[in-house]
Amino acid sequence: MIRMIKGQIYFTSKYPNIIIPEKPIPHLILKHIRSKPDQVLLVDGLTFKEYSSHFVADTIEKVACGLNKLNIKKGDVLGVILPNLPEYVPIFHGTLLMGGITSLVNPDYTIEELSHTLATVSPRYLAVTLAVYEKIKNDLKRVFPSVEKVILVDIAGQTLKEIGQLTLSSDGIVMSFNQLINNNGKDYPIVRIDLKKDTAIIPFSSGTTGLFKGVCLSHHNLVSNTHQTQTVETTNYKKNDTVMGQLPFFHIYGLMTYLILMVKQGHCVVILPKFEFVRFLDLIQKYKVAISFIVPPIAIMFAKSPIVDKFDLSSLRTLFSGAAPLSREVEDLIKERFKGKLIIKQGYGATELSPACFVIPSGLIKSGSAGILLPNQLVKIISPETGENLGMGEKGEICIKGPNVMLGYYNNEKATNEVIDKDGFFKTGDIGYVDEDGYYFIVDRSKELIKCKGFQVPPAELEALLLSHPKVADACVVGLSKGDMGEVPRGFVVIKQNESLTEKELLDWAHPKIANYKHFRGGIFFIPAIPKSATGKLLRKNLKDINPPKL
């Protein structure tokens, strides 16, 4: 719908504005799961252990009590470096219940990656597995000088005995999750929270370009997006639906879907710590999963893998794909394979939008569309050349305003002002348009950001890594299309004068410093000079399609 404001064109949602509850996230969650105490809310996909709503609610409050005993204060940060585990849910909500902030990162991150993500928000507490602790313990005081307590969470195959030994030998800094929740769940204060100003979580995003930044999302941001999404998505769920929980909880897509939306709606979530396609299919069959939230690489497996035919997936009703665009070709292949019985939907968003802004309504799918604008939001589409507001059907940068727009980037006013304009619109960096039915189409993803397996890989981060090598004079990183993976990083390097360096030497040096999905699967090429504009901006597009010989 078009709205004219001061002579400028804006677009509103087809849905009427909704009332956003004025409650902190954990209060909202506890209210809903306490109403169905005997329902199975979580299932450990490795051990098959089931957790009732009553147990989860009690454990949330026990985490709050445990943190209160550790003297947590409003605004203190608890860094979560965990794979998907049932304990993630009470740790997340228990921290928020005490007015704390959870900051979530990939447990596969190296020390170097943790140092410029989680360490930048000065966490007072960490929640980790034994494997993560072993990785960080020697650098703990250097990388995390602010940390006072490390909470070790058990995982299948790891014994409590191992954790117990660590708690006795680490100068009191380490405790087990079981020690944290060894209380009655009653002794914690009610913390007053400013819903619109107080940060609840700090996930990390690169925005459209640059290094990763902490994204400050308030309780109001999260509650708003929960209800905005439910307005469109409620008809897609049935009362006793079971959902697969394989998307990473540290990613805003998985966080909002499983830790908030599904838990609030009371759907049982079958949790997988690490994605394995065969186990994933087996769990769908075993638990008669109805809905699975996926990323395009998983969609491609559904479309093409012969393994799919070995499982009874008749319970599966809907696949919801996000984090990166899903091609129409893959969508058609899945529909053909499942004889049209499987609904495939997409949405669009960003970490900075908490995360959803467009969702395809049930039964109203339009090919190639990112969906319809969720309620309580305003859109303007601006010309990349002139900055003027454009009309229906005209292609420009999509900008979003609403209660789901982030507070800002953590301790980075400059970066915040670059993406949120003076009127409060978040500039997505993506080019698109809206049609006469209110469906939005993304025609050009942010040019610089590499999307690998649904994860964001900022070229600037990898360029900084390459440039730190003593023999590298200049570097540029671009995304290379790579089938099921989406895009993979490809590096271009200028070697310092009078130095010699091979691709293998550089890869062997770089890969241990970065997560697996950031590896240079597109290779590293050596060239005489990196193309740049007159202002010194890297001309990545000039390098996208060239394949120079490797030295």
Swiss-Prot record:
It comes from the Eukaryota. CDD domains: Firefly_Luc_like (cd05911). The keyword Magnesium applies. Its cofactor is Mg(2+). Both substrate-binding domains (SBD1 and SBD2) are involved in the substrate recognition, and are sufficient to confer the substrate specificity. Carboxylate--CoA ligase that may use 4-coumarate as substrate. Follows a two-step reaction mechanism, wherein the carboxylate substrate first undergoes adenylation by ATP, followed by a thioesterification in the presence of CoA to yield the final CoA thioester. This is Probable 4-coumarate--CoA ligase 2. It comes from Dictyostelium discoideum. The lineage of its organism: Eukaryota, Amoebozoa, Evosea, Eumycetozoa, Dictyostelia. The gene is 4cl2.
